[in-house]
Amino acid sequence: MSDFLFPIIEIFLGVVLLFTGGEFFIQGAIFLSLILGIPQIVIGLTVVSLGTSSPELLVSLSSILKGSDSLAASNVIGSNIFNVLVVLGISSLITPLKVKSRIVRRDVPLLMAISCAVWAMSSTGLLTLQAGIFLIFCLILNTIWEINTINEKGEETKDAEPEIEELKDNYKGKMNILLKLILGIFLLSFGSNILVNGSQTLATLLGVNEIVIGLTIVATGTSLPELVTSIIAAFKGKTDLAIGNVIGSNLLNQLLILGSCSIFSGFKGLVIEQSLIKVDLPFMVLTTFACLPIFWSKGKITRIEGFILLNLYIFYILDKILFLNEFNFLSELRIGLFIYFALLIVFLIVQEKLKFSNS
């Protein structure tokens, strides 16, 4: 019993630090967007997503240095799945998330293309040094692209002009914003590390496979900053930040983290296990493709769609549990899950087409 006590305390402390860090970070990000006149969707896609992706980056690079390629890759894949299904799912249950047209026109198609490229490059079982350089190059191009949208001044700045002017002329106020951002990132990163350490220790004591640990416990632990930040943003009515955080984080997870891990692995490349290539990467791509019709329909993510996303994650976790217990009909269950997911995407597309034709 004493062996389990310390990791449980670590998990609890990690969650507390994550919630505290998420609150500080989201406050700083909101005021930063107001002062600079940057649309909150751009802040969500860049500053917030970079801050909340820092735990994934630290954990994955640490895994590479320790020779654990499986943990590094499964962490990224599992985090991307968690972000779409759980983070967007729970956030939309709190309040329906309005989706701006630039997300549908630009960011989701880009995420779809990058996800397919990562899957294709990983199909040989190796994400090479050249692939890593390509991903980092795409990251640089995407960052330049996002910076060019800064001129799209957000409407939210017009409603807060007095507050903005006061902050602009107040040195103490500026330092307070910077302090909140730095403290938020620190608490998010530190909290995630404690949580992951506790989760890994607990999973090891229970005898769980490393890939499954990466896809579930570690991915959930490192994705909690995204979850906490998006939930806080949803409660504050900042749906741009909630959505932008998820899309931006998923882009960074693949471009920055997988790119960096591939480069850090050197000429040997980052090893991608066959189980990830055959099951989890395709599922990640499907969750990404599901974003487009969901965002497209009604211009928002409804509570019903959020509920569906959460159910899909429950199916995914069930698959991992049955895999651990060597379930005899696991292949049939996976086929059924993929068919269900594909039908869901088709249903959402047809629903939107019918709505468009009737309008």
Stretch-by-stretch model annotation:
Residues 1-359:
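Hydrophobic alpha-helical segments, chiefly the membrane-spanning helices
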